[in-house]
């Protein structure tokens, strides 16, 4: 991380240039110029600035306006085209560039791909009426906006407009906390106001190799009882964010050590074996997993993490957690399928391929992958063969072929096609001619 002396506007502008693609940087300068023309201070605030300073910057950032962000975004759209989406209650607007924007902008840096979009936010203050409540929002100053942040490391702002481009604004000790590697809230009631910050504190601590400040550990211990007052959706969202991280195993272990997991729900387990399973997700996925889908809207890593973490629980415990933490239907069913599968794996270890396929075909593929990662050695070969080969075995004969042979549509179709697949799986058929001979016999039987 650069020293305090290196964080002058020129050096910050240089860091920004290194972190952003040319098209984003050019558009940022354009937006900064537009803000100057309207007399609006414009900033990047929070996580992007934090990550810029520790060398991990991405492309996800909000542009904070000391003024009316919605009006500013609409004026940009009127001048440069694109679509604006407004959330008036929060004073936010999203500007998505489109082909019309490309025609109006004289920037020769655009390349094919996803067109940039920018989120504009009015500087605002927040008030929490009671622990765990969503905040009441109203327009405010930059100081107000920084003061509503969760941790001091997220209170750094980078000014963009005019002569101030690259100026680092640090009103609340964020730079010192970042340099010391401390996760610290802004005020003693912070964890009580929003108990999800407890989970976020651990997430930041483990992601960056920081330490939660000693006084914060005391505040967390006093506030963790308020986790029970949060909705299942909010808690699950925080768990989703943790499970998407590379250091998810360390994060969950830390939460367990602080007695936070049982504070979320008494049935949430943790042990060293689960830690090793989640760490295994850092290894490249086997080739046999090609084509394995996500669990609908749940990314594959997050879905697998839930399955490895909770998939050995009893069905009644899974149902309880799924209800309390507002799991999606697809995650609930995958967990229940995996729980049942674990009980059957010993019997599948020496079974015929057709028996294995009959048992696994109704199980979500991601649950089969989780079983492969967590199963004892005797079950590994059948799970690997299913994922790599057996699930793709199909007879050459189709329903259209049966129609051509004069067989009227009905239950016999499924019986015939299933019998042909079983014969291929169990090695009873070697050639297409073998299949045709068996097909003739099956048609005569029905």
Q: Which residues make up each language-model segment?
A:
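Catalytic cores of the polymerase beta-like nucleotidyltransferase superfamily
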Residues: 1-446
């Amino acid at each position: 991380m650069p020293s305090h002396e290196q964080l002058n506007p020129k050096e910050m502008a240089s860091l920004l240039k290194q972190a952003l693609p040319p098209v984003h940087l050019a558009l940022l300068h354009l937006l900064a110029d537009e803000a100057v023309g309207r007399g609006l201070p414009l900033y990047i605030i929070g996580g992007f600035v934090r990550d810029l300073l520790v060398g991990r910057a991405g492309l996800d950032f909000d542009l904070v306006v000391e003024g009316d962000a919605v009006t500013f975004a609409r004026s940009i759209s009127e001048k440069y085209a694109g679509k604006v989406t407004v959330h008036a209650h929060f004073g936010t607007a999203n500007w998505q560039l489109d082909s019309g924007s490309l025609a109006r902008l004289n920037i020769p840096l655009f390349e094919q791909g996803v067109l940039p979009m920018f989120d504009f936010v009015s500087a605002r203050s927040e008030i929490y009426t009671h622990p765990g409540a969503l905040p009441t929002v109203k327009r405010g100053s930059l100081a107000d906006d920084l003061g509503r942040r969760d941790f001091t490391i997220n209170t750094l702002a980078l000014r963009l407009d005019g002569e101030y481009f690259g100026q680092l604004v640090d009103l609340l000790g964020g730079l010192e906390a970042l340099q010391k590697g401390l996760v610290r809230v802004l005020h003693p009631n912070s964890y009580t106001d929003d108990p999800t910050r407890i989970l976020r504190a651990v997430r930041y601590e483990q992601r960056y190799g920081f330490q939660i400040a000693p006084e914060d550990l005391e505040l967390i211990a006093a506030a963790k009882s308020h986790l029970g007052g949060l909705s299942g959706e909010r808690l699950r969202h925080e768990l989703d964010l943790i499970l998407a991280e590379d250091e998810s195993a360390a994060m969950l272990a830390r939460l367990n050590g602080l007695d936070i997991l049982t504070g979320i729900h008494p049935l949430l387990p943790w042990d060293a074996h689960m830690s090793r399973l989640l760490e295994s997700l850092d290894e490249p996925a086997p080739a046999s997993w090609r084509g394995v889908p996500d669990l609908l809207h749940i990314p594959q890593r997050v879905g697998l993490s839930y399955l490895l973490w909770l998939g050995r629980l009893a069905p009644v415990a899974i149902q309880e957690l799924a209800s309390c933490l507002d799991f999606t239907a697809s995650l609930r069913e995958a967990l229940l399928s995996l729980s049942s599968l674990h009980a059957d794996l010993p019997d599948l270890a020496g079974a015929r391929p057709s028996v294995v396929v009959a048992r696994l075909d109704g199980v979500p593929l991601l649950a089969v992958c989780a079983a492969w990662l967590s199963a004892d050695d005797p079950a590994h070969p059948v799970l690997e063969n299913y994922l790599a080969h057996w699930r793709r075995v199909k007879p050459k004969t189709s329903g259209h072929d049966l129609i051509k042979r004069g067989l009227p549509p009905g239950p016999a179709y499924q019986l015939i096609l299933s019998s042909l697949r079983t014969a291929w799986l169990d090695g009873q058929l070697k050639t297409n001619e073998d299949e045709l001979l068996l097909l003739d016999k099956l048609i005569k039987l029905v």
